[in-house]
């Protein structure tokens, strides 16, 4: 499947930009008939001479304005009245000639700093863009779990100081780049692409069972107090399972209980003998149940047939 979600053919790479890392179609080799091939080795039907000629004729026949396709033919360029249109067909007010001339005059008249940024009034969007101002977007930040990645105070945070920005700019100018302007890998393995690292530190090697945990065990007919599981009585153990949507079948004295994290169903125990906490076999979702019981290789959602708690009295 191509990156555009099509199964039958891959798109030509004429439009690939530098960030996507694709090669331009004119730099790729074609076969004797002028076709390109997809990554899977199939012939790209859109790269043939007939398709390319047809596309060229269609492009020449489309009405244009200032070198761009006009909106009445599906383009987003300036129309005959020199404005752009929204997707719903209305005039975009910021693209009118008056608005563009006003923006141009404002941009030329406003003062800039040594980095080329606008020096706007304090509190304006131009002066504080990318920084955190007290009271701004508090609700949105709380929904995200706090002010993540945002400076608490731009006045004292060094990342917003001019010296820090100048140093970053100097380091960026000194780094080597390839033919497309991308940073070349450095000695420490940094490849210059934000969000991508050459090592795999994000993968945790110890797969912990985050699904269920037991909170103590009692040997006198207590209730299983899991996440909203009320009504499943187990003789000989107190299980507090936090597993999401798991089944604990026949745990401690053949009591069948279903416990889930939210809105779970828990059935009554059947044939529970008081005094004996028997073997629990095939307990799905490793919730630790019974006295001195252990579930090995337990994960939420996975089936692990583990024997737990073979204590007899």
Swiss-Prot record:
Q: Where is the composition biased (Basic residues)?
A: 194-205
Q: Where does this chain mainly localize?
A: virion
Question: Where is this chain compositionally biased, Low complexity type?
Answer: 206-266, 272-313
Glycosyltransferase is among the record's keywords: no
What name has this protein been given in UniProt?
Uncharacterized protein R705
Q: Which GO terms describe its cellular component?
A: virion component
Region entry Disordered, spans: 1-313
Species of origin: Acanthamoeba polyphaga mimivirus
Keyword ATP-binding set for record: no
State where the protein is found: Virion
The protein's UniProt keywords, in alphabetical order, are: Virion
Source organism's superkingdom?
Answer: Viruses
Q: Could you tell me where the Basic and acidic residues compositional bias lies?
A: 24-33, 40-85, 95-116, 156-181
């Amino acid at each position: 499947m191509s990156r555009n979600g099509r199964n039958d053919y891959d798109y030509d790479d004429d439009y690939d930009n530098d960030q996507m890392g694709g090669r331009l179609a004119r730099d790729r080799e074609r076969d004797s008939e002028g076709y390109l091939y997809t990554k899977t080795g199939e012939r790209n039907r859109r790269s043939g001479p007939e398709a390319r000629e047809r596309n060229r004729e269609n492009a020449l026949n489309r009405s244009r304005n200032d070198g761009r396709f006009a909106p009445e033919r599906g383009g987003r360029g300036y129309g005959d009245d020199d404005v752009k249109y929204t997707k719903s067909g209305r005039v975009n007010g910021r693209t009118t000639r008056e608005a563009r001339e006003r923006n141009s005059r404002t941009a030329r008249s406003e003062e800039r700093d040594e980095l080329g940024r606008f020096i706007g009034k304090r509190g304006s969007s131009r002066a504080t863009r990318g920084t955190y101002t007290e009271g701004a977007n508090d609700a949105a930040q709380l929904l995200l779990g706090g002010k993540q990645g945002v400076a608490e105070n731009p006045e004292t945070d060094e990342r917003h100081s001019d010296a820090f920005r100048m140093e970053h700019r100097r380091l960026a100018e000194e780094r080597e780049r390839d033919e497309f302007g991308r940073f070349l890998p450095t000695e420490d393995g940094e490849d210059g692409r934000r969000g991508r690292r050459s090592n795999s530190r994000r993968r945790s090697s110890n797969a912990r069972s985050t699904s269920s945990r037991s909170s103590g065990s009692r040997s006198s007919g207590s209730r299983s107090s899991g996440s909203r599981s009320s009504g499943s009585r187990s003789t000989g153990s107190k299980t507090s399972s936090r597993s999401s949507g798991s089944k604990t079948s026949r745990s401690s004295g053949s009591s069948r209980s279903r416990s889930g994290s939210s809105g779970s169903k828990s059935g009554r125990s059947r044939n529970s003998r008081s005094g004996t906490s028997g073997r629990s076999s095939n307990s799905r979702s490793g919730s630790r149940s019974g006295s001195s019981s252990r579930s090995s290789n337990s994960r939420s959602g996975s089936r692990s047939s583990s024997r737990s708690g073979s204590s007899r009295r």
